[in-house]
């Protein structure tokens, strides 16, 4: 065999394996290429692990989407709380009778002016149980039968005073705290914590990961401010009623 043919054969048998990118499911770890023990021959590695390539910018996109969802839920909850007992949906979560039927399956509620709710019971035989469910709900509301009508109840609402406005504002603040930082999975703090937990599995010395952590923190602060603005607007609306 010629010297040139021998060299070509040697090169073809000692080429190092290529690194490859494996698909990344939700939040896999960002791994560096690790070298194992070598066989002693130059250019040969026996135990090299492949590189997993992750677009860490997805964390920022995901954080923004989840924070935006939290903002929408917070705004909706504030609106519900702001109405207080005057909301036609106030009884929707009640369970009625021994069988625990949903209130909305047995009756519908509408607002009459600013000081009363009208409950229309679909079947007269359920009226008594509807009354019991409302009185047992701890809402301090007393439904009364409308004369000559077995299917409608009138629920008088307490007058709006400075004290009631302040009480509503206190409830609004509680909603804000829940969506700012709590065990609630939609809270800004919980969302941030879950994302940071995933980021800890990535390379801490990686510059891209560091940048993502900084970006997520920045976005979290921005949405906390937006949440505070929603609270201020809701409180202002209540106190100016």
UniProtKB/Swiss-Prot annotation:
The keyword Cell wall biogenesis/degradation does not apply. GO terms for molecular function: ribosomal large subunit binding. The keyword Magnesium does not apply. Its main location: mitochondrion. One of its GO terms (biological process) is translation. It comes from the Eukaryota. Belongs to the RRF family. Necessary for protein synthesis in mitochondria. Functions as a ribosome recycling factor in mitochondria. This is Ribosome-recycling factor, mitochondrial. The lineage of its organism: Eukaryota, Fungi, Dikarya, Ascomycota, Saccharomycotina.
